[in-house]
């Protein structure tokens, strides 16, 4: 089972990153994608990935919250980072109109520019969308034929939004949000509509700790070692074997991000 969304650059992991990776390995996590959310974070994610070759890979991009930092220099930095074999996707990029830490126009500019970079480099794109579906799809659609793959991570949308994403060819990342008995029930009901070959699973650690873990961890920090719990729960709700589903999502991640095919 492969975790496609780990924010290992977070300061919450500052004191024990090696132990976090070791715990994930011990629990059967077969690899992880480290998320770049800004230029410095993308550089940091790459350094961490290079420290665990064959197990960790990274993305390079600017998150919509940080879109106000977009410049021509940022675009050049992303292109330079993307040359490295461990960098396998452009992102995390997209739109987030929920909190608007950057203005919608700043977000749209940065998102469109990163889609152009991904298309130009022939790389998958790792995306974020919150309360911005219509505009997100409007900006994304013109690029889809030029992208080898497009992943929408941490999907929390509606059935209609899911259908539109699937029809457009997107792969869908599901987090421990689905384990939340308060907020996750609507998402849980959508699991059966995601085809096996479009499903990806992720922790989004250190965020989104599954609420139904037993026993409950003493810390609120999420970790990749909890991915097996998400796999088991999703498998049960999809009426699938958990071991088989773990293999499916691992195969999907390796195919979509072309792991081992970039000069490694």
Swiss-Prot record:
Record's subcellular location: Cytoplasm
Entries under PROSITE patterns matching the protein: TATD_3 (PS01091)
Entry cofactors: Mg(2+)
Keyword field contains rRNA processing: no
Entry-linked Gene3D superfamilies: Metal-dependent hydrolases (3.20.20.140)
Keywords, alphabetical: Cytoplasm, Exonuclease, Hydrolase, Magnesium, Metal-binding, Nuclease
GO molecular function terms attached to this record: 3'-5'-RNA exonuclease activity; magnesium ion binding; single-stranded DNA 3'-5' DNA exonuclease activity
CDD domains attached to this UniProt entry: TatD_DNAse
Highest taxon listed in the record's lineage: Bacteria
Annotated disulfide bonds: none
Residues noted as binding a divalent metal cation in the record, renumbered to the chain: 92, 128, 153
Gene Ontology CC terms, in alphabetical order: cytoplasm
UniProt EC number: 3.1.11.-, 3.1.13.-
Protein task: 3'-5' exonuclease that prefers single-stranded DNA and RNA. May play a role in the H(2)O(2)-induced DNA damage repair.
Family: Belongs to the metallo-dependent hydrolases superfamily. TatD-type hydrolase family. TatD subfamily.
PANTHER family: DEOXYRIBONUCLEASE TATDN1, TATD FAMILY DEOXYRIBONUCLEASE
UniProt-listed HAMAP family: TatD_exonuclease
Quaternary state and interactors: Monomer.
NCBIfam families: PRK10425.1
Name assigned to this protein: 3'-5' ssDNA/RNA exonuclease TatD
Upper taxonomic lineage: Bacteria, Pseudomonadati, Pseudomonadota, Gammaproteobacteria, Enterobacterales
Primary gene name: tatD
């Amino acid at each position: 089972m492969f975790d496609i969304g780990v924010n290992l650059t977070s300061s919450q992991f500052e004191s024990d990153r090696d132990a976090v990776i070791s715990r994930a390995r011990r629990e059967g996590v077969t690899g992880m994608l480290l998320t770049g959310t800004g230029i410095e974070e993308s550089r940091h994610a790459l350094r961490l990935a290079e420290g665990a070759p064959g197990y960790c890979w990274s993305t390079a991009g600017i998150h919509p919250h940080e879109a106000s930092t977009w410049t021509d220099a940022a675009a050049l930095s992303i292109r330079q980072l993307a040359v490295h074999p461990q960098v396998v996707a452009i992102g995390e990029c997209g739109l987030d109109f929920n909190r608007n830490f950057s203005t919608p126009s700043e977000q749209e500019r940065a998102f469109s520019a990163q889609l152009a970079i991904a298309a130009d480099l022939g790389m998958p794109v790792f995306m974020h969308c919150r309360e911005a579906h219509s505009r997100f799809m409007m900006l994304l659609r013109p690029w889809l034929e030029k992208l080898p793959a497009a992943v929408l991570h941490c999907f929390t949308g509606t059935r209609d939004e899911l259908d539109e994403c699937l029809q457009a060819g997107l792969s869908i990342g599901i987090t421990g949000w689905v384990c939340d008995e308060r907020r996750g029930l609507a998402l849980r009901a959508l699991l059966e509509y995601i085809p096996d070959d479009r499903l990806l699973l992720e922790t989004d650690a250190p965020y989104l700790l599954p609420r139904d873990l037993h026993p409950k961890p003493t810390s609120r920090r999420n970790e990749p070692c909890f991915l097996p719990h998400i796999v088991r729960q999703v498998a049960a709700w999809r009426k699938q074997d958990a071991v088989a589903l773990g293999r499916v999502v691992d195969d999907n991640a390796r195919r979509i991000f072309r792991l081992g095919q970039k000069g490694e």
